[in-house]
């Protein structure tokens, strides 16, 4: 455990969940939804101390009376005021630290607009007065966490999915592919196919229930067509879910139809390739000499790779695309939900990393654009 008084803070700001903690720890201290909620009703009880906004778990627990908004969409911050609230909440309520005393490592999806990381840098230095900060690419951190220096990372979270091939520690930027199809789109898809059974999830609070159903009951079918046949001929795949008011609902083939969209984006009306093909295309954009190593080191990371059966399905799909002689290994570490954060914790505590930080002095000399020069 690093000395907490000066330890770097690692914040993985996902589109769905924010993971935060101290560098050198093996797991994040705080994991909470990246949500800002505002009351949608008039407050009538005087002296209740009602707030005009709630963040994270508190917003989640009061969701019945709030309108919930996610300030990060597809890995890009769309509402900076709310984003500041989330960071403020992270520092002062979750970690209980003074940001002006700690260097901060933030994470970002690859191929994000440049303005996004400039603004992140600006807020860290100007609003929170951090002494130093750094922005790291999410997939690279996941590879650190898996203990590899070579591999292709398929990182799929709530807002964005991307494949990043890395060879001997070098990211190959020309081969990075990004797919704006992730957990939130799957939740939307589940909401849609549940209406066929007559279940309606309309409010922002009810969407959270759909997300919970997705996380608890959905799985990836090894053979989608076969699974569909099984589900029509018997009730073996049906499960029931208890709503917060005690009502029971039944869910059948929706359990695997929802995550199937990862492999067949056409289900969502998207003209994109599935995650298996995206991974394969990413590998094919690399030099012919390094492909073999990438095939045998495919690493899954992020919450949307937590579906049961996803590793087996990836293995099967990539095997059918790749040359027959190639050995394909899909690594799905059990802690992959947090592997970006864990990688950040490893990186920020390396002695060799200490000269990589962007210091406040450098920022004041050069301005927000320094982030492109010092961070990959």
Curated annotation (Swiss-Prot):
EC number: 3.6.4.-
MF annotations from Gene Ontology: ATP binding; hydrolase activity
CDD domains (alphabetical): ASKHA_NBD_actin
Compartment annotation: Cytoplasm, Cytoskeleton
GO CC field: cytoplasm; cytoskeleton
Enzyme class (EC, first level): hydrolase
Keyword Transmembrane helix: no
Principal subcellular localization: cytoplasm
Catalytic activity: ATP + H2O = ADP + phosphate + H(+)
Listed SMART domains: ACTIN
InterPro entries assigned: Actin, Actin/actin-like_CS, Actin_CS, ATPase_NBD
Keywords from the named record: ATP-binding, Cytoplasm, Cytoskeleton, Hydrolase, Nucleotide-binding
Top-level taxon in the UniProt lineage: Eukaryota
Function: Actins are highly conserved proteins that are involved in various types of cell motility and are ubiquitously expressed in all eukaryotic cells.
UniProt family annotation: Belongs to the actin family.
Full protein name: Actin-2
